[in-house]
């Protein structure tokens, strides 16, 4: 209860304070869609640095979830509305590889509770900011299907063909979600890709059974969406190096959200990544770093380092979702700082 009261107070306070004047705030709010589109034009640098961070809310679906998204968007001054995906496919008793054949294609109706959240947020903010719902990967839905405590890699290897059919059905299910969300106000999508890190699946199964259906999600999003972010997820399973990351360069997307550190001890060069992908990079900060655990001043110093080494057309954010307890006031301070960074630093 205290946390809820604190966040309510924080929303009220943050709505009346900030780095910019009220007039400037209104100008930014009315042009967030335009400012994101300007970043996509890599023929010229942009003085304004868009920024956004994400965290999961206590309320997952329904009116309270809509309100949580509204409060967070307003309080942090972020540049687009990212809608969390909080619906799970039913668990199926997968005891052997053959049981993957039980996985169906889920219809648009299955995703209706999630789409309702998108529709409400689009009604509220669609004219001022892009509405970008999260899209989980087919592999993530496969994990939901078997539930906790089961070895997905082992079950996939028992019957790769049946597993591949399940992944296909889950990818087609996600396509149904995408098309429904687009009809109800989504401008595009934040598409998560998983499985290509070389850890969660064997390279053979990834290449032969999963990759085309993982990529299919991005292809559908690209077909129907105005703007899309590809999130190359390494949650719990880091990629070996940057070259492994660049294997996703053929995925269609407007913007790329990237991991920062690799299992061989190396780190990502943001300018090189933007050049290799040929699209703006979104990220730069570690989700469990200073943005979660440091002070506002420490976080600003980290932003300095990121933006000094990033390409001119860049969107500041984290490499994945930040912890739910992350201070909203700190996120607001960092976002406001990024917005004006190139002007205040003459870069």
Predicted region positions:
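N-terminal capping/small domains of soluble enzymes
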Residues: 40, 44-103
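Bacterial N-terminal signal peptides that target proteins for export
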Residues: 1-9
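Terminal low-complexity, poorly structured segments
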Residues: 9-10, 228
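Generic low-complexity segments that are intrinsically disordered, proline-rich and/or Lys/Arg-biased
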Residues: 4, 21, 26-27
């Amino acid at each position: 209860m205290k946390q809820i009261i604190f966040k309510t107070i924080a929303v009220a306070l943050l709505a009346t304070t900030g780095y910019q004047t009220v007039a400037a705030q209104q100008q930014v709010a009315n042009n967030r869609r335009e400012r994101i589109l300007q970043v996509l034009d890599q023929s010229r640098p942009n003085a304004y640095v868009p920024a956004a961070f994400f965290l999961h809310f206590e309320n997952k679906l329904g009116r309270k979830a809509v309100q949580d998204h509204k409060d967070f968007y307003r309080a942090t001054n972020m540049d687009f509305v990212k809608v969390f995906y909080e619906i799970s496919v039913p668990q199926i008793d997968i005891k052997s590889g053959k049981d993957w054949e039980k996985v169906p294609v889920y219809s648009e109706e299955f995703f209706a509770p999630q789409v309702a959240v998108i529709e409400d947020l689009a009604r509220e903010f669609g004219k001022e900011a892009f509405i970008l719902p999260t899209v989980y990967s087919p592999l993530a839905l496969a994990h939901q299907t078997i539930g906790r405590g089961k070895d997905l890699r082992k079950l996939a290897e028992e019957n790769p063909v049946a597993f591949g059919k399940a992944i296909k059905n889950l990818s087609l299910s996600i396509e149904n979600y995408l098309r429904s969300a687009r009809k109800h106000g989504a401008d595009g999508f934040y598409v998560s890709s998983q499985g290509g890190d070389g850890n969660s699946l064997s390279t053979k199964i990834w290449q032969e059974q999963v990759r085309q259906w993982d990529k299919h999600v991005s292809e559908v999003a690209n077909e129907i969406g105005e703007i899309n972010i590809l999130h190359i997820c390494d949650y719990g399973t880091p990629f070996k190096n940057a070259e492994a990351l660049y294997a996703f360069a053929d995925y269609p997307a407007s913007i790329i959200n990237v991991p920062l550190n690799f299992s061989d001890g190396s780190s990502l060069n943001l300018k090189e990544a933007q050049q290799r992908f040929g699209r703006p990079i979104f990220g730069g900060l570690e989700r469990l770093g200073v943005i979660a655990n440091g002070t506002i001043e420490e976080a600003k110093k980290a932003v300095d380092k990121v933006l000094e080494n990033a390409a001119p057309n860049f969107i500041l954010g984290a490499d994945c979702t930040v912890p739910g307890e992350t201070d909203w006031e700190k996120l607001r301070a960092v976002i406001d700082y990024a917005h004006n960074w190139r002007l205040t630093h003459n870069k």
